[in-house]
Swiss-Prot record:
InterPro entries: Class_I_gatase-like, GATASE, GMP_synth_C, GMP_synth_GATase, GMP_synthase, GMPS_ATP_PPase_dom, Rossmann-like_a/b/a_fold. Gene3D superfamilies: 3.30.300.10, 3.40.50.880, HUPs. Keywords: ATP-binding, Glutamine amidotransferase, GMP biosynthesis, Ligase, Nucleotide-binding, Purine biosynthesis. Signal peptide: none annotated. Homodimer. This is GMP synthase [glutamine-hydrolyzing]. GO terms for molecular function: ATP binding; GMP synthase activity.
């Protein structure tokens, strides 16, 4: 008996077309998600071609799609087998809309099954790289080279195709690797063209988007800026908006965009909890307040946060206490500076996909904030702070936010800033956080960033930082015995932070960093290098 894999959670289907602006209706590729780990990646690949795409629930009906008016529909992969009991299925009327459809892996098998074909457990599954042998190089496979490497991940196989379908390509183990019903514009691929391992995948996606769906390149940064400013002004009017500025690319880009849209009706609040990197709070205020003339309400809460962490060693308790204190400070300061009608959040599109638990005001239909965005790692705001939300970035992926930031004048030091956890250095100090330990780690971390920055390799790494351990080791300095802290260096390469590999940093660079730390940072006499990937480890130590 086949073990049933739970179907993906249902994305709210209420008023789906209302989420899409008039400009994008009729120029959108919809991805119906069946629980694939790559659904977001498909959307990103399509957007890279300057065509808008959205990920919707597989339960989205044909009627709802008619209202959205997509130029094309993609059925994602998924963890199920189409013959599993309760396996997710789409509305079969979708295939009668006259809109081009591309099924990917599970999506192809589902299309075959729903249109009268047959899918069976493959005699031999196919996982990893495979050579694609092209039988028909037209339409979907135009400009895809024969014997291109494609990424396979399937245990089932299509054995009988529905009427009207033909085989476009095969692999050594999969007779039906790409199929098409040209008359109805229905296509399927057993591989994943969206992943980086699929060499001809981008060409295939462009073929579907432009040659089959006949899309136009309307998803541009300039068009997004113009539309966002118009939407923010329409939503907010002359009312006041509060933004909690963190210094990261999301909140900084949001601040620039909102200030361009509503000017002085935006209030940026920066709560300095004392756990940022060396010089960052001062630099943030200087950039926004003095250089770009976007006023920032600076709140020095360092002592309050540090007091909350006295004697605390558990990492989850640290996060909880930091989050709780952030809420207290935020509430006090918003009451002092307010009143405000709106809370601006740097919610991104992956957050929208992952969570459909937004609260809706029954009178206005607007989403109401009961939480501060999870990237702050601070938990929820009190329910009596009933701000309405303004979220101009909620259609964007992280890489699109960076492009937007550059376009509106955000400096590169923020646009390409390494990801930094909400609790900051507090979770890079293993054990209790004290003022002394913060100073040690802040100095060590500065040396790491300084050495790779002056060599011009800062952007070669997803993250590069130091971790302070709560132990001591014996050393010898100046013919004297020392007993001081070891520091861990953590250098990571990654595309999105979901998986990561430890970076092969040249020894001479590691040596230079180590020498500076043990000579310049009082309280450290040993430096070690973390060579753990994610998985099994995580990027951060806590």
């Amino acid at each position: 008996m086949t073990t049933q894999i739970p179907v993906p959670p249902v994305v709210s289907d209420q008023a789906l077309p209302d989420r899409i602006s008039d400009r994008l209706k009729g120029q959108i590729i919809v991805i119906l998600d069946f629980g694939s780990q790559y659904s977001e990646l498909i959307a990103r690949r399509i957007r890279e071609t300057e065509v808008y795409s959205e990920v919707l629930s597989y339960r989205t009906t044909a009627q709802q799609l008619r209202e959205i008016k997509p130029k094309g529909i993609i059925l994602s992969g998924g963890p199920n087998s189409v013959y599993d009991q309760g396996a997710p299925e789409c509305d079969p009327e979708i295939f009668q809309l006259g809109v081009p459809v591309l099924g990917v892996c599970y999506g192809m098998q589902l299309m075959v099954k729903q249109l009268g074909g047959r899918v069976e457990r493959a005699k031999r599954g196919e996982y990893g790289k495979a050579s694609l042998h092209i039988d028909d190089p037209t339409d979907l496979l135009t400009n895809v080279e024969n014997d291109s490497t494609m990424w396979m991940s399937h245990g089932d196989s299509c054995v009988d195709l529905p009427t009207g379908f033909e085989i476009l390509a095969h692999t050594d183990n999969t007779p039906c690797a790409a199929i098409a019903d040209h008359q109805k514009a229905l296509f399927g691929v057993q591989f994943h063209p969206e992943v980086v391992h699929s060499v001809g995948g981008i060409a295939l996606i462009r073929n579907f988007v432009y040659h089959i769906c006949h899309c136009e390149p309307t998803w541009t940064t300039a068009a997004f800026i113009e539309e966002s400013i118009r939407e923010v002004r329409s939503q907010v009017g002359d009312r006041r908006v509060l933004l909690a500025l963190s210094g990261g690319v999301d909140s900084s880009t949001l601040a620039f965009l909102l200030h361009r849209a509503i000017g002085d009706n935006l209030t940026c609040m920066f709560i300095d909890q004392g756990f940022m990197r060396k010089g960052e709070p001062e630099r943030l205020v200087e950039l926004f307040d003095h250089q770009f003339h976007i006023p920032v309400q600076y709140v020095n809460a360092r002592d309050r946060f540090l007091k909350q962490l006295e004697g605390v060693t558990d990492p989850e308790e640290k996060r909880r206490l930091i989050g709780h204190e952030f809420i207290q400070v935020f509430e006090e300061e918003s009451n002092r500076l307010g009143p405000f009608d709106y809370l601006a959040q740097g919610t991104l599109y992956p957050d929208v996909i992952e969570s459909a638990d937004s609260n809706v005001d029954p009178k206005t239909g607007e989403r109401v904030a009961v939480k501060i965005k999870s990237h702050h790692n601070v938990g929820g705001l009190p329910k009596n702070l009933r701000f309405k939300l303004v979220e101009p970035l909620r259609k964007l992926f992280k890489d699109e936010v960076r492009k937007l930031g550059r376009s509106i004048g955000l400096p590169e030091e923020i646009v390409r800033r390494h990801p930094f956890p909400g609790p900051g250095l507090a979770i890079r100090i293993i054990g209790e956080v004290t003022s002394e330990r913060l100073n040690i780690l802040r100095d060590a971390d500065f040396i790491v960033r300084d050495e790779i920055s002056k060599r011009g390799i800062y952007h070669d790494y997803w993250q590069a930082f130091a971790v302070l351990l709560p132990i001591r080791s014996v050393g010898v300095m100046g013919d004297k015995r020392t007993y001081a802290h070891p520091v861990v260096l953590r250098f990571i390469t990654s595309e999105d932070g979901m998986t990561a590999d430890w970076a092969r940093v040249p020894y001479d660079i590691l040596e230079a960093i180590s020498n500076r730390i043990v000579n310049e940072v009082k309280g450290v006499n040993r430096v070690v290098y973390d060579i753990t990937s994610k998985p099994p480890g995580t990027i951060e130590w806590e």
